[in-house]
Amino acid sequence: MKIYRPSDTCFDEMKRRMNRRALPEDSVRDTVNAIIQDVFARGDEALFDYASRFDKVHLDSSSLFVTEAELAEAEAMVEGSVKEAIAVSLANIHYFSDRSRRQDWSGVNAQGVEVAERFLPYDRVGIYIPGGKAPLVSTSIMTGGFAQAAGVREIVAATPCGPDGRVNPALLYALKASGATEIVKIGGAQAIAALALGTESVKPVENRLRCLREPGSERFRHLCDLRRITGAK
């Protein structure tokens, strides 16, 4: 554990970081809300514009999703040790998920009426993997893996691509192993809005990303309150 003391030269800076606002600045909030409304209004066109503006990549309807060829290429590029580590991580997630899952039950109450509960997975959920300095393979496993273990039929992943239109091979491999059925090459607030609201190309998901408290920018953290997205409707 790293310990900081008042006598340390970096103490004031660390104190400033620890005391930062839990909520985003108004300017960030306004920017995110504007992006959400824009995606709602313009759909795919807004996604392509933001990809060009923020990620410096030209996308269109033919390059918006990761293809099977790209997945196959990524699998060939990933080292065996990385594949093994991903498999072990997924096995651990499935082990935990299987034992923590709520179980169906039924019974007869005092009036002789049969009562029961069934717990069914969503048909279609979205997961978001932020971009940044390093590919967040762990995030794809810890979100997609749980949805996969729950039996979700359609797992839609969104993650930003690079200026060349490519996504990190290890991340792609992990997403496929975690059950992703679609991978959208879009990041940021526009990706979350597309998953929640839908566009011409992106079918909306049922579960609006409850696993949002992952690494990400201040704009991304603002999206933890998804009532703003549903309000766009």
List the predicted regions and their residue ranges.
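N-terminal Rossmann-like NAD(P)+-binding subdomain of aldehyde/semialdehyde dehydrogenases
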Residues: 1-123
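Short acidic/polar active-site loop segments enriched in Thr and Asp
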Residues: 43, 153, 181
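Buried hydrophobic positions in well-ordered alpha/beta secondary-structure cores of metabolic enzymes
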Residues: 43, 125, 147, 209-212
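Positions that flank functional sites
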Residues: 54, 162-163, 190
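General beta-strand structural signal in soluble alpha/beta enzymes
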Residues: 105-108, 127, 138, 157-159, ...
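Conserved small-residue-rich beta-alpha loop and adjacent elements
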Residues: 107-173, 233
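Conserved NAD(P)+-binding/catalytic subdomain of aldehyde/semialdehyde dehydrogenases
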Residues: 177-233
